[in-house]
Every structure is written in structure tokens, then in C-alpha cells.
Swiss-Prot record:
Site feature (Important for efficient shutoff activity and nuclear localization) residues: R195, K198, R199
Protein family according to the UniProt entry: Belongs to the influenza viruses PA-X family.
Pfam family, any one: Flu_PA
Entry text on domains: The probable endonuclease active site in the N-terminus and the basic amino acid cluster in the C-terminus are important for the shutoff activity. The C-terminus acts as a nuclear localization signal. The C-terminus is recruited to host protein complexes involved in nuclear Pol II RNA processing.
Superkingdom in the source lineage: Viruses
Record organism: Influenza A virus (strain A/Swine/Wisconsin/1/1961 H1N1)
Site (Important for efficient shutoff activity): K202, K203
Disulfide bonds: none
Name of the protein in question: Protein PA-X
InterPro entries assigned: PA/PA-X, PA/PA-X_sf
GO molecular function: RNA binding
Active site: E80, D108
UniProt KW keywords: Decay of host mRNAs by virus, Eukaryotic host gene expression shutoff by virus, Host cytoplasm, Host gene expression shutoff by virus, Host mRNA suppression by virus, Host nucleus, Host-virus interaction
Length: 252
């Protein structure tokens, strides 16, 4: 799984995920499923904000790569992936500037058009189950929740999906690609099932002669940036085009 993560994700995302795990005492080389989960969540957050700007009339517009955006304001402030202290500084600054209530937990993004924080989730389970867990934890009507699954399902607060359909399709396609690449390497089942993941972890450590003295029980402490993962969909009419925008993972 570690090799898969390093081959299939942008090096910047991998570096941020490693830094986050180490901040919480987690080892990317041991808790490889969590490593993959964090990288996936970070990439979804970055894709969520990609190409979205606000023009001089306050309208949300999409600017494709290569087009001029020098005079435009980014629609989304990315909070996910920042150092914890820096992230809270950004949140406090946004709250002081906009008057929006301060969230209890660090959100992932801030939407300058809708003036709201956004919590992104990526789940391997039913989207409505994970959505309710998020809502019960956050307990704030001011933070907008948007959940994606690997099955192509999504759920958002008040059915407000924030982004246009094509932007969301890009995210779903990327999740589909990740799932397919994992499956082709025999990694998907252990990624979905915690029990299988634990069994695989012990097997890997044993094969490396590292079992003694090393923890084989996966930590249940959850990093704020870690959102659970799972299964996927794709509209066949645009799958080839959208999927081509992502580099194919290298075979081992």
C-alpha cells in the first residue's frame, strides 16, 4: 500500500500526509491504509477548490488551466493540509473578517462566495451514515458538510452540492481511479475491511522480520484531516476524458 500511495499521489500530498500522521504519532510505513486515506482526502479537498474563482461582480466562475486568473480571487480557502497552528490562525482571521461563527473543529475549506466553512468527507460506507456521524460531531449549522463515496454517491447539507456537476464528476472519477488501481494490486479488500487490514499488516511485518517489538494494532486515534473511505461510480460518456486528466499509476 505504501508503494501505491507514493506512485499514485502527488508528492506534495504525500509529504503533507506524512507530516500530519507524524504530528499525531502515527507511522505511514505501518499504518499504510490510514496513509492512503489521508492522501485521498487531501486530494479531494484540493480538487474541490481547483479552478474556482470569484470575479469582480462577485460571481463564481471556473477558469481552466492556462487561462489568466491574475485579477481573480480564489473562491475557496484551503485549510486542510496546513500546520495545525497555522490552520487555526487562518480560521480565526476568516471569522474576524467575515463575522462567521468560529467552528469547534478545524474545517477543510472556506467558501468565500457562500460565506461558510466546508467539511469534506470521503467514505467507504453508506454516505448517509457517515454524513450523520459528521453532523453529530460538528453540531454546527454554519459548517457545510459534503460527503463523497467510492460508489459515486454523495450527500451534502440541505442537498446543496456547492460545485457544478462537472467539477463533482472529476472528483468522483478520481476516486473511481483510486479504487480501480487498488483493486488491480489486490489492496482494495484490506483498505475497505479493518479486520483484513490488520491481518495484512501483521503478515507484512512478519515477512519483513519486524513483528517483534513493533505495534501491530492499528491506532484508533483519528487525525482531524483523516476522513474515512470506501467503493464507486462513473458516467461512461465522460469517463475516458476525465480519467485522462490523471496520470496512470505506475505498475510495481
Amino acid at each position: 500500500m505504501e508503494d501505491f500511495v507514493r506512485q499514485c499521489f502527488n508528492p506534495m500530498i504525500v509529504e503533507l500526509a506524512e507530516k500530519t500522521m507524524k504530528e499525531y504519532g502515527e507511522n505511514p510505513k505501518i499504518e499504510t491504509n490510514k496513509f492512503a486515506a489521508i492522501c485521498t482526502h487531501m486530494e479531494v479537498c484540493f480538487m474541490y477548490s481547483d479552478f474556482h474563482f470569484i470575479n469582480e461582480r462577485g460571481e463564481s466562475i471556473i477558469v481552466e488551466p492556462g487561462d489568466s486568473n491574475a485579477l481573480l480571487k480564489h473562491r475557496f480557502e484551503i485549510i486542510e493540509g496546513r500546520d495545525r497552528n497555522v490552520a487555526w490562525t487562518v480560521v480565526n482571521s476568516i471569522c474576524n473578517t467575515t463575522g462567521v461563527g468560529k467552528p469547534k473543529f478545524l474545517p477543510d475549506l472556506y467558501d468565500y462566495k457562500e460565506d461558510r466553512f466546508i467539511e469534506i468527507g470521503v467514505t467507504r460506507r453508506e454516505v448517509h451514515v457517515y454524513y450523520l456521524e459528521k453532523a453529530n460531531k460538528i453540531k454546527s449549522e454554519e459548517t457545510h458538510i459534503h460527503i463523497f463515496s467510492f460508489t459515486g454517491e454523495e450527500m451534502a447539507t440541505k442537498a446543496d452540492y456547492t460545485l457544478d456537476e462537472e467539477s463533482r464528476a472529476r472528483i468522483k472519477t478520481r476516486l473511481f481511479t483510486i479504487r480501480q488501481e487498488m483493486a488491480s494490486r489486490g489492496l482494495w479488500d484490506s483498505f475497505v475491511s479493518p479486520r483484513e487490514a490488520k491481518r495484512q499488516l501483521k503478515k507484512d511485518l512478519r515477512s519483513q522480520g519486524q513483528c517483534e517489538g513493533l505495534p501491530t494494532k492499528v491506532s484508533h486515534q483519528t487525525s482531524p484531516v483523516l476522513k474515512t473511505l470506501e467503493p464507486m461510480w462513473m458516467d461512461s460518456s465522460r469517463m475516458a476524458t476525465l480519467r485522462a486528466s490523471f496520470p496512470k499509476c505506475l505498475e510495481k
